[in-house]
């Protein structure tokens, strides 16, 4: 695809999120969501591979159905309240429909089935876009309506998403599917906390974007599509292999890495509201997720299978790694540093709480 076309589409995606962020009416929110969906579709199927086109069609159908649900909620509110305002109180039916629509857009339980299959059919850069930036607009809507929808329903769906994300990733050998279930689990943590503290939920969402972006970029750099291919990264680039292990452990929430911040502030927020049962469920789901994170780390560093010496040079030629400094390298270095050492920023972040 032409670079100028890609830049225009990316600009439209950014503008659509800004429209959703600045909207106070359901009409503008629906416009922003539709612009966001229609702009990302050509990027997802830009390679015109059969699997990529299939994933794009699945993504389009899911997003169209969820947008129709949100539009129906807006029309019901217009009929009941004679207003397009997002802050207008919702009745019980509209609250449940809107919650399910946002779960469908974010890939949360019980509407998570489409996300792993769609992500498996895309490249790592397309999966990065789908797992991070495409979640921003639905997350903004969820933040806007979290005070007018059922807190118990949102917390329950978040806890179940953590369990489903941890359980679903146990028997996976494809890195993209593992990242899909990891996304489901992390967004479950965020939704469980969002009703009690929007500030904590936003911090967790930013940390999730940084960690996921780092993992996707490293895997894209090394063409690491399954667990068996992870071992070659250490042979070809020892520094990047060790960074991948640390970022994966950070994604699992092990201290003293950045990912531990999400677990700590989430549990602190829930315990301050005397929610012991959700905390226990989240911890169990986090342990399930930690198992396949450790599998990735084990295959990346400890399982060093015998390799031919010429494989080192062929791998470097394919990946384009020659040690030169580029924007991609600088971006990956910054994200890796934030993913590993970001816990040092906790005092500065908590001072504004």
Swiss-Prot record:
Q: Which UniProt keywords apply?
A: Electron transport, Membrane, Mitochondrion, Mitochondrion inner membrane, NAD, Respiratory chain, Translocase, Transmembrane, Transmembrane helix, Transport, Ubiquinone
Q: Which GO terms describe its cellular component?
A: mitochondrial inner membrane
Reaction(s) catalysed (UniProt annotation): a ubiquinone + NADH + 5 H(+)(in) = a ubiquinol + NAD(+) + 4 H(+)(out)
Annotated GO molecular function terms are: NADH dehydrogenase (ubiquinone) activity
Entry's localization field:
Mitochondrion inner membrane
Keyword ATP-binding tagged: no
> Is the keyword Magnesium in the record?
no
Q: What is its EC number?
A: 7.1.1.2
| Membrane topology label | Multi-pass membrane protein
Physiological role? Core subunit of the mitochondrial membrane respiratory chain NADH dehydrogenase (Complex I) that is believed to belong to the minimal assembly required for catalysis. Complex I functions in the transfer of electrons from NADH to the respiratory chain. The immediate electron acceptor for the enzyme is believed to be ubiquinone.
Entry protein name: NADH-ubiquinone oxidoreductase chain 2
Q: What's the source species' lineage?
A: Eukaryota, Metazoa, Echinodermata, Eleutherozoa, Asterozoa
Q: Gene symbol?
A: ND2
